[in-house]
Curated annotation (Swiss-Prot):
Keywords: Cytoplasm, Protein biosynthesis. Gene3D superfamilies: 3.30.1360.40, Ribosome-recycling factor. One of its GO terms (biological process) is translational termination. This is Ribosome-recycling factor.
Length: 185
C-alpha cells in the first residue's frame, strides 16, 4: 500500500524535474544551441512540420546556427516560422541556407534571464511541494481508513519529505548550473 504512494511521488517528481530540465534547454544563454529551435513548426505545403524534419541543423560556431532546408523552396516558410516562434533571433537567408546569429547577451539581459530561470525553478519546487501535499493527504486518508497504523503514517510522511527534499535539491543543482552558464561571459 505504502509502496504505491512512494512509487507515485517518485514518478511525478521525476517527471516534474524532466519538464524543468526541458524548459531550461529553451532558455537562451548567449551560446548557440539547437534546443532553441525545438518546437518550431513550419507550415510546409499546408502541413505543420517540425523544423528538424525539413532541414539539417548545425552549430558550426558557438554563436551561429545554420539551417539548411532539404527543399530549397521551403526556405521562406522556414524563415517565417522562425520569426513567428518569437525566439528573439533574426534569420538571414542566402537562398540556400538560413543563418541565425546569436548576439552576445548584455549584462542586464543576463540578469533578467537568470531571474526568469530562478522563477521557473521556484514554480517547479512548488509543483514538488504540491505532490508532497497530495501524498501526505493520501497517507492521512489511509490512516483514517485503518489501512495503515499511526507509526506507518509518520514513517510514510518522513519518507515523502526526504524524497521531496532530494528532488528540490536536484532542481537547485540544475538551476545553479544554468545560472552559472547564463552569467558567465
Amino acid at each position: 500500500m505504502l509502496e504505491l504512494v512512494y512509487e507515485e511521488i517518485e514518478e511525478k517528481m521525476g517527471k516534474t524535474l524532466e519538464v524543468f530540465k526541458n524548459d531550461l534547454k529553451k532558455v537562451r544563454t548567449g551560446r548557440a544551441s539547437l534546443a532553441l529551435l525545438d518546437g518550431i513548426v513550419v507550415d510546409y505545403y499546408g502541413t505543420p512540420t517540425p523544423l528538424n524534419q525539413l532541414a539539417s541543423l548545425s552549430v558550426p560556431e558557438s554563436r551561429l546556427i545554420v539551417i539548411q532546408p532539404w527543399d530549397a523552396t521551403a526556405i521562406k516558410d522556414v524563415e517565417k516560422a522562425i520569426l513567428q516562434a518569437n525566439i528573439d533571433l533574426t534569420p538571414s537567408n542566402d537562398g540556400k541556407v538560413i543563418r541565425l546569429s546569436i548576439p552576445p547577451l548584455t549584462e542586464d539581459r543576463r540578469k533578467e534571464i537568470a531571474k526568469r530561470v530562478n522563477q521557473m525553478a521556484e514554480e517547479h519546487k512548488v509543483a514538488m511541494r504540491n505532490i508532497r501535499r497530495d501524498a501526505n493527504e493520501t497517507l492521512k486518508q489511509m490512516k483514517k481508513d485503518g489501512d495503515i497504523s499511526e507509526d506507518e503514517s509518520f514513517a510514510g510522511k518522513d519518507k515523502v519529505q526526504k524524497v521531496t527534499d532530494g528532488y528540490i535539491e536536484r532542481i537547485d543543482e540544475v538551476f545553479k548550473a544554468k545560472e552559472k552558464e547564463i552569467l558567465e561571459l
